[in-house]
């Protein structure tokens, strides 16, 4: 079904495919169309995430853009006031889409810098005595794993306690 959806993308449209996902890589091998761009940490991505730095209150990363027509360029120091690898993935997909719509790099970077996230998606509730409390509405194992990975990236030597309500 997903392959058919991509194949039916009209010539004026583009699909943006997450190349870090092994299932997407398998699907790409079977596609007849080239009407898509890829993004992710994978070095073969058209929009490759690199130089990622995870901090307590923000994430900073660069983006190598390659094989987009005759364009190859680098966007440096993209600042997200969010933590977690999943947020970097989502931001990269948004950047790719915005660039394809003709938005300027500085406009995109400013919008991402000012974006504070979605409520209950790794929302910092409070900090007290070096203890941070986050609220997240992850509801399946993949999302829960992404949240824990994001928290671990910024709390490298800190204890993490998770409370889960099924």
Language-model region placement:
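Switch II (G3) loop of P-loop NTPases
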Residues: 133-139
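Active-site beta-alpha connecting loops in nucleotide-dependent enzymes
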Residues: 118, 142-166
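Acidic, Mg2+-coordinating active-site environments of NTP-dependent enzymes
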Residues: 1-133, 153-159
